[in-house]
Amino acid sequence: MKNKVNIDVPDAILEQLDDSVFESTNYGNPEIQRVGPKVRATTGESKVQSSIDDVLSNTLKDGMTISFHHHFREGDFVFNKVMRKIIDMGYQNLTLAPSSLTNVMNDIVIEAIKKGVVTNITSSGMRGTLGDAVSHGILKNPVIFRSHGARARAIESGEIKIDVAFLGVPNSDEMGNANGMNGDAAFGSLGYALIDAQYADKLVLITDTIMPYPNTPASIKQTQVDYVVKVDKVGDPDKIGSGATRFTKDPKELKIAKTVNDVIVNSKYFKNDFSFQTGSGGAALAVTRFLREAMMAQNIMASFALGGITKPTVDLLNEGLVNRVMDVQDFDKGAASSMKLSPNQQEIDASWYADPANKGAMVDKLDVAILSALEVDTNFNVNVMSGSDGVIRGAIGGHQDAATAKLTIISVPLVRGRIATIVPKVNTVITPGDSIDVVVTEVGIAINPKRTDLVEQLKQVPGLPIYSIEELQQKAEKIVGQPAPLKFTDRVVAVAEYRDGSVIDIIKEVAD
């Protein structure tokens, strides 16, 4: 069955997932019944355990669904520690449902798949050796990729039923009151883990620092926690987040960032109390810097900045240019350390951030979003998941969610090396073109023709080169030529869902 973005989804996949095809970015106002976790009452006994082995014996069975968060990023020690125990204890047929998978997790997940320990995965994304292995058919069942908002929705609705959540935290007291702001391995907001804490049947905290009771502020609360496991170390602070922010000096990135800024400040959305999400890449950080200068020059103050937060965004808060920072994750130490000092840097969970099936998410109030891409096609569809070789090497993250902003800008170079980024058709549609308003490259911009208001506004800007998306695609092709067609088998190795749970695309096994 074909969906709205002209992807033919096999009926067998729809039946296997009990799913429907993507039809619209408009979620509407359905009435939804949420699920609740099982709770075993306790009366104040310490929950601290010295061994993960006993906890696994008491909580985990074959066929269950387990979850982790990715806030430690490449500095994560918890995931591998727990998965090693699970493999060694011989568990089978588990569903792995983390908020995302980072490179440091790849080797042990591949081992778990080969040994039959993990037979299903749902995640925001994957990269490196794991992405390559899945793309070549290592996993028994298709991976399901969901955005951060869609994952929250799926957990709340029971589509993802977490039996046991293993959440690493830099601190906890003996009852399970914990936060991400204090300790050697502090990473700031626990945003993506909080939904697991709320809905998992069993919640296991793993920490290297036991604090006096009661430990506050408590992002995760003792009312949610079953066990606290003390370990030597939960993470490497130097790999959790970057240190001092380094602004890009790359001329191409700076040109893109300057053009993105020109689009924003010349749009109707650049006014007092506007809101924005900028991201964490080199060009995104440069946009934040240019935006700061424009806000100061025009005496404009933003109501809130949203999403993954960086030190430059926190600086805007401290300078009085942003009223609130709504923080679902922190990308650097500066952002992570400031949360405990500022009441205006608010920790939010993934549902509050981006869930379409609640009573109002932050993305619903977002004016401007600046997002990146691996590819954009002539229908403005965006791929952030698979590379030019067809191999999985990315993550949906909050891309689909933030793209619901009133002004969604994709910042992307025209080509990367010898690979075009503006193409006739993307390998994998992740964010539909209906969500995208402007594509910005170093040579110029393309405006979605459906946005006639933006066309009228931006064509008045002196020196702003405007092309059709087809013209940008042709410029890219002239530089790098046409690539050879990719070869795939008929086997589906992954399914990309839209934020409402419908199937927006499928990823097939790469043929060698």
Swiss-Prot record:
Gene: citF
Keyword Heme: no
Listed name of the protein: Citrate lyase alpha chain
EC number: 4.1.3.6, 2.8.3.10
A Pfam cross-reference name: CitF
Reactions listed under catalytic activity: citrate = oxaloacetate + acetate; citrate + acetyl-CoA = (3S)-citryl-CoA + acetate
Gene Ontology molecular function terms on file: citrate (pro-3S)-lyase activity; citrate CoA-transferase activity
Role description: Represents a citrate:acetyl-ACP transferase.
Lineage, uppermost ranks: Bacteria, Bacillati, Bacillota, Bacilli, Lactobacillales
Cross-referenced Gene3D superfamilies: Glutaconate Coenzyme A-transferase
Superkingdom, natural source: Bacteria
Keywords from the UniProt entry: Cytoplasm, Lyase, Transferase
Gene Ontology cellular component list: ATP-independent citrate lyase complex; cytoplasm
Quaternary structure and interacting proteins, as annotated: Oligomer with a subunit composition of (alpha,beta,gamma)6.
Any single biological process term in GO: acetyl-CoA metabolic process
